[in-house]
Amino acid sequence: MKKNKSTIILILVFFVGLSVMLYPTLSDYVNQRHQSHAVATYSADVDKLSDADYSAYFEAADAFNAQIAADPDALYFPDRFPGYESTLDVTGTGIMGYITISKIGVELPIYHGTSDGVLQVAAGHLEGTSLPVGGASTHAVISAHRGLPSAKLFTNLDQLEVGDTFTITVLDRVLTYEVDQISIVLPTETDNLKVVDGKDYVTLMTCTPYGINTHRLLVRGRRITTPDKLKHIRVTADAIKIEPIITAPIMALPLLLVLLLWLLFSNRKRKSTRGEKHETH
């Protein structure tokens, strides 16, 4: 009876360990499916808009950005600018667009604000900074978590180098930015996030060092002309998540086989021992 209990305990321990090992991959896969669906829904809703709708949304965003550019303290007092939540909210879900970083295989919906609920599953637009629609004297800041066991998000943002590009899609615009500055600052240091007169910037922000999170990694991009080949390319979550969902069970299979072989060997050894005792008596 004691041996049977030991076997059951070992099996339970194994499956608990297997669940712990698979959790990050499976959870990330579910999150990426959610992100992909959110982007697809956004794109479908955008396709239904008329040219007049596009113009109205962009005019509202440009007017908002003009207010941000005119206020040097906008980042510290975002409540000064009413109407933020509704500007560019085409779907009514808070999504204003999506960001694609091909080098690290990331495509994330961009939501209004940087609440923890947003940053757990997607990218958030930092309130008090320019909306990401481009234009002179704009500087949008997009933030996402790093190192979550449930989602990759900006985990690999540190792999970007000066000269790499990323795109932001808002309504029918695909805006391309080339990384021109990478810096690490304290959370209280915000000078690198302010609007620069005449410049069109987007900064990607996440915590660093990995797992410690005492500083902020800022990856700034300057606006460049979008190449035709990038205007219709999407790095979907489905495309980049197939591999982990397949490889995780493959990695777990050897452990399962080892356990099964051990159980089989132990059972045979016990039977053999019992047989020898029976012959002795």
Feature annotation, model-predicted:
Residues 1-3, 278-279:
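C-terminal accessory segment of soluble enzyme catalytic cores
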Residues 234-281:
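C-terminal single-pass membrane-anchor helix
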